[in-house]
């Protein structure tokens, strides 16, 4: 995702004591949406010009999107490329991105729990049909979500090279 909104400032890293996120809560472990993977992540060593920094999960438009772990919403808004986009900070340098949403249900600085519904699957921004574009970031680097959710390997519709 090339169009990065300025989302990190000192106020976003302050989490109230009564909303502390435990280590086990911040690791993505809840599937964000039931569906099929139509496009996989293309890493930095890919020979493709337009890298794909996450996975696309095809699902019925309007289906609920769940937070993969507890955290604070640091961005909930519109970008040209991702359309309606939600970015959640989970602590321990984890961020998750949920793009092309029909509707964002959460707002900036909302606290979410693992499994909370945060948005609805859509077809906004630069999109070829209803799906969720899902990314995991750790320490400023994009990580393949298939590592965290190997069950998607059984639902992978992408062409093998």
Describe the predicted segments one by one.
Residues 1-44, 158-161:
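Polar/charged, compositionally biased leader and regulatory segments
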């Amino acid at each position: 995702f090339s169009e990065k909104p300025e989302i990190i400032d000192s106020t976003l890293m302050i989490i109230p004591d009564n909303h502390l996120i435990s280590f086990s809560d911040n690791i993505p472990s809840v599937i964000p949406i039931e569906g099929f993977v139509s496009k996989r992540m293309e890493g930095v060593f890919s020979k493709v010009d337009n890298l794909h920094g996450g996975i696309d999960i095809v699902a019925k438009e309007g289906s609920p999107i769940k937070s993969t772990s507890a955290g604070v919403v640091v961005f909930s808004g519109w970008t040209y490329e991702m359309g309606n986009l939600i970015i959640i900070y989970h602590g321990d340098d984890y961020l998750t991105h949920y793009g092309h949403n029909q509707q964002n249900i959460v707002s900036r600085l909302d606290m979410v729990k693992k499994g909370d519904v945060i948005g609805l699957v859509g077809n906004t921004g630069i999109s070829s049909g209803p799906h969720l574009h899902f990314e995991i970031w750790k320490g400023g680097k994009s990580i393949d979500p298939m590592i965290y959710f190997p069950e998607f390997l059984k639902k992978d519709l992408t062409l093998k090279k």
